[in-house]
Amino acid sequence: MTTLNRLLESVFEGKRFESAHDPIPTEKIDKAIKQIPFTLSDAQKSSIFQAFSNDITYIQGPPGTGKSYTISALTILASKLGMKTLVASQKKPAVEIVYSKVSNLLGEEGCLFLTDDQNRKEATKDLLQNLLTLARQEISNKDLSNYQKLEKKIDDLLEERDRYAERINYYNKEINAFFNLNEETQRYQDNLKEVNEIKEEVLKKITKIDNEEARDRLLKYVEECRKIRRKSFETEGKVSAAQVLRLNFLVTTVLKNLNIDKEIYKNYGEEILETFIRYSREISKGINKQNLVKKFPVDTIRTSFDDLTNQLYPSRDLENCILSKFLKLSTNLSIRKLLEDKSYLNTLSDFRRRLHWRTPKKVKEFNKKIDFKKLFDLFPIVLGEMRTLHPYLPFKEELFDLVIVDEASQVNLAEVIPILFRAKRFCIVGDHKQLGIKAGGVIFLNKVTERLNWQKRFEDQNQANLTAASAKERDLLVSTSSILDLIRNENNTITSVPIVLNEHFRSMPMLADFTNNEFYKSDNEQSGLKIMTALPQNKCLNSFKNIEVKTPREDSDEDNPGDKVNPGEVKKVYSIMKSIITKKSNADTEEVLNLPPLKDKQITLGVVSFMRDQSDRIREEAPLSFSKDELKSIDFMVGTPEDFQGNERDVMIIAPGVDETCSRSRGFMENDQRFNVASSRAKFYTFFIHGKLPNNMMRMKTMLNQMGIEVKDKKYQDGITPLGWNFLRSNCDSNFEHLVADQIEDFIAEKASDRLMLFNQVESCGYFLDFVVYDQLTKKSLAIEVDGKEHFYSDGFTHTDRHQERIMTLRRAGWKTHHLDYWNWFEDGWIDSESSAVQKLKIYLENFFLK
């Protein structure tokens, strides 16, 4: 039974949906992931493993979290694993983005884009013709040799990187062990000095116990001393001479072994002896581990590992890296090898001719001539807009190994079921916290008609006895539900737990924080999005401007009601548009035009309004104020949140179309999904232009409040200090961190007090960074992390994976990180403020910031 049939059966007959296809082995997926030039987050990897393990998967992609990137990676991996994949979306821009990413890595022949767009269709015909021409040429020995050389070089690089990873894993475990031992030693030292008032020089003279047997023997002696002393208490001080001699012998032996003065024992008794013994053993173990760790070439190995990582998975220019070159060449050679078979050549030729035709009769005639199995052997990746795909594809069950449905919250059941009919596995990608089916386009049926049709065709025809009302509850009605609604519905037995993509790359921190706090973060500290743009140079920038206009909405005049338009908002929108187009700043736009990421750049601009009347007014009147070229220069877009889902711009203007009389519009304007989309479209800056807000517009006021607090918190020099960051001594977890802070503060005071700033426990990318040094002049920043601290775990590969995930996450966000060699800051178990490591840190800071 097909996956679609099993899905429908589970809904209509109340049966639990179970995956029927064998999961792809984890080892194969792991190997394939290493062979594509993407650096994937934990969440992205999890979503990929789920998609290859289950027949139905839901990937939730909040705004700006790399949904298209994940789909592209999943698509390329499926191809490498020998699978045929279809990517379909309700919106063409979503398909275009995935096509661009895939073709950049695989080459134009790496995927087949099926569409009615004439320009795209002509480009596809040209591609097919080029392949037909290329097929006349034999595969040269040079091409084969290049392929073999690239393959061997990649295998060598991957093997070498794995070897370094294993060594880093071992080093990290030992560094972590030293860190934990040393922290325990520091606690003993602090306790002995502060509670027992033992002087530091006494502690430094204590003999180190170098084995467990010696420690246990001395502890036995101490316990025997306790028993003798207890017995003396019980007998009111009457102790035999033998016991006195024994006590004296035991105490003397312990003191001699520890090199401790007898006066300390007289003051504190056996308890202090036990503490000294345990401390002595811990400091000995720490020193032994430190001596081992000091021999590790950690910096060299990390540098080599990073170099290999940059060769294989560069952060920029992916299409020109070695893995992409190999993917392009292997794709090209694979197609050319198949085209040596005349039947494949004929298939390609037939399909090219078929692209010429649009009439149903001709399409049907030419489709019959095409061997689609061979076509999809040539092009295992197919992409297209939902409504245009069907004429190009045979209506054959489980034609594709994997179907990925993007923007799934906007895909109604009537359109998607024929697509899913062709799938063995399908992956639903979307976000139930953004706009749903009503934003997706045409609703096919009148709701009354749909209810009557359901009663006629389905009631009493299924084991679950689903009425029209219960069908609506289960999200089975075309007019109200999407495929995403269906699989998430808890009344159905197919509920799919989403894998949430949680790294946000789109918006400036101030804007992304609002989206995260308002829509994605819960009381759980681990919930919400990692704001990957939260770098110092971005945190110091204001990205929001509130502008209130005094005009009422036109329809507020009861005697002569007009459209749902606030003319003051519209007028201010045009003023800002004019300033951005001409790059002539005014009081409203001076900040945005001088924003470092936008200064002297071509800025794209969008205007979103909750009221269709207002967005239509702006769209219709904009050409009266601006030329076609001027609007094109800012890639101008205006619409409602429904229009904007899936789109973004450098600068967004939110002009809701509101005044103080609009209290009854709150449910519409402040709807969770609608407001989420409207407020998350801007990459760099948002203008909020509005009439007087009704008292009940709480979400708009929350946005103003959060943005206002952010701006208010900027209490240092304007545009210089990262918002919300600070330096608190109470955030230092240990004496060592206090020492590091001392040294950095000394360096700043001596070298660059007017430029450099120190922060600690800085929240960024879902982590807390130990220290961050920020240069107000150059906007450079450096994260300083303590090796061995809580960033490590003790269990094998998870230990390295977590550490490497942290490093790779910060790398993806653009952080430069310096790891402190914790083990070099101690001498014989004591912090050494004069160690070479201190000077090493200061030299590094000077080279990084001042040279």
Residue spans of the language-model regions?
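Conserved helicase NTPase catalytic core signature
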Residues: M1-T39, N257-L399
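ASCE P-loop NTPase helicase motor core
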Residues: H21-A135, F249, P360-F519
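Phosphate/oxyanion-binding active-site loops and adjacent basic polyanion-contact surfaces
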Residues: L40-A43, P63, K67, A94, ...
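Charged C-terminal transducer/switch regions of large nucleotide-driven machines
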Residues: E109, D116-S315
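Helicase C-terminal subdomain and adjacent C-terminal extension
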Residues: V442-I499, K628, T661-L758, G829-D832, ...
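Helicase-core coupling region on the C-terminal RecA-like lobe
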Residues: V497-S579, N647-R649, V677-N735
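Core RecA-like ATPase module of SF1/SF2 helicases and allied nucleic-acid translocases
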Residues: N538-F687
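Short beta-strand-loop-alpha-helix junction that forms the active-site gateway
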Residues: F768-E805, Y822-E827
